[in-house]
Amino acid sequence: MNSNISSSPKILIMAGGTGGHVFPALAVAKYLAEKGWQIRWLGTADRMEARLVPQHGFDIEFIDIKGVRGNGLMRKLAAPFKIIRSIIQAKAVIDDFQPDVILGMGGFASGPGGVAGKLSGIPVVLHEQNAIPGLTNKLLSKIAKKVLCAFPNTFASNVANVEVVGNPIRQELIELGAQIKTPQADALRVLVVGGSLGAKVLNDVMPAVVAHLSKYHSLTVWHQVGKNNQATVKASYQQLGQSDSVNVAEFIDDMEAAYRWADVVVCRSGALTVSELAAVGLPSILVPYPHAVDDHQTVNASVLVDAGAGFLLPQTILNADNLAEKLQLFAENRQELAQMGHKARGVAVLDATQRVADICASFARKG
């Protein structure tokens, strides 16, 4: 074995389930890998990390674990035994890899992995992306050496060793936000993002919104509708005579290009989305997913809304009329558009990736 590889520091990263956990963790992994660290991932085989992590060149190990919230009685009764089994599986991975530090960034594997790390005497560092912590991180915060969070006041005051560091995001988005952007004087460019599965409420109302606004203003729309929704949403735009001004896509592979194109974004308010909007300096109309655990997306949205960088439209009151009204404000006042973008950039934490990586490195050195 190459002596440089064998002596380089090692980190086990636990993150999975959603892009909001996986992509920030990948940003940290890439940063540390460039510094010579050995990276190994702990996840579950049936979630997105199983595909994304190897695509980015990192080794991943799997354990068997599911969520425990909101399940039936029999599953809850079986849960303790399954958790114990998954802790044993995670400890086997740790014993094999011998990491210097463990970073937990959310997802099902983080709980058993964090407990196994504690039992193995390995320093555990947590990062919480949302404004309200998930159940796993709430529990692990009691045993972690350091608890990192994206937003202030995320954890209770009795949780020790908490530090606000922001959400790690891709470097190209940080660089995009550093460029001075002047909203176009012609058509208002509206980016609609509903996540990998799309947001049904946005898919339903946007065609009517565009049909109404196009009577008074020039606008173009890039609408990401989610898997298997493209034909239906495209037909809705066509029926209202709006197909020429709208680009309907199942997915947007290049979000940097989408953010660069857009004047304003209509979207959910997942933690990563909120952090990216701040970093690229774009105003937004935020429609929190109403069924998110502890309604954390509404709290996430408040980071931008309270700064004057976005508007909040709860799904319970959202309709074509009030969404069109908000977009009309942007269409009629490009100066307001620019000011809100500047305010968004003002709440961005641009060195989050380095801060998370440096803190992990500091605990690895302490051993």
Curated annotation (Swiss-Prot):
Chief subcellular location: membrane
Gene3D superfamilies documented for this protein: Glycogen Phosphorylase B (3.40.50.2000)
GO terms under biological process: carbohydrate metabolic process; cell division; cell wall organization; lipid glycosylation; peptidoglycan biosynthetic process; regulation of cell shape
EC identifiers of the protein: 2.4.1.227
Top EC category: transferase
Residues binding UDP-N-acetyl-alpha-D-glucosamine, per UniProt: T18, G19, G20, N130, R170, S196, I252, A271, L272, T273, V274, S275, E276, Q297
Pathway listed: Cell wall biogenesis; peptidoglycan biosynthesis
Source domain of life: Bacteria
GO molecular function: UDP-N-acetyl-D-glucosamine:N-acetylmuramoyl-L-alanyl-D-glutamyl-meso-2,6-diaminopimelyl-D-alanyl-D-alanine-diphosphoundecaprenol 4-beta-N-acetylglucosaminlytransferase activity; undecaprenyldiphospho-muramoylpentapeptide beta-N-acetylglucosaminyltransferase activity
Pfam families, per database record: Glyco_tran_28_C (PF04101), Glyco_transf_28 (PF03033)
Keyword Signal on entry: no
Known catalytic reactions: di-trans,octa-cis-undecaprenyl diphospho-N-acetyl-alpha-D-muramoyl-L-alanyl-D-glutamyl-meso-2,6-diaminopimeloyl-D-alanyl-D-alanine + UDP-N-acetyl-alpha-D-glucosamine = di-trans,octa-cis-undecaprenyl diphospho-[N-acetyl-alpha-D-glucosaminyl-(1->4)]-N-acetyl-alpha-D-muramoyl-L-alanyl-D-glutamyl-meso-2,6-diaminopimeloyl-D-alanyl-D-alanine + UDP + H(+)
Compartmental location: Cell inner membrane
The entry's keywords: Cell cycle, Cell division, Cell inner membrane, Cell membrane, Cell shape, Cell wall biogenesis/degradation, Glycosyltransferase, Membrane, Peptidoglycan synthesis, Transferase
Record's bilayer topology term: Peripheral membrane protein
GO cellular component terms, semicolon-separated: plasma membrane
HAMAP family assigned: MurG
Function: Cell wall formation. Catalyzes the transfer of a GlcNAc subunit on undecaprenyl-pyrophosphoryl-MurNAc-pentapeptide (lipid intermediate I) to form undecaprenyl-pyrophosphoryl-MurNAc-(pentapeptide)GlcNAc (lipid intermediate II).
NCBIfam families linked: murG (TIGR01133)
Family: Belongs to the glycosyltransferase 28 family. MurG subfamily.
Name the record gives this protein: UDP-N-acetylglucosamine--N-acetylmuramyl-(pentapeptide) pyrophosphoryl-undecaprenol N-acetylglucosamine transferase
Source organism (scientific name): Shewanella frigidimarina (strain NCIMB 400)
Encoding gene per record: murG
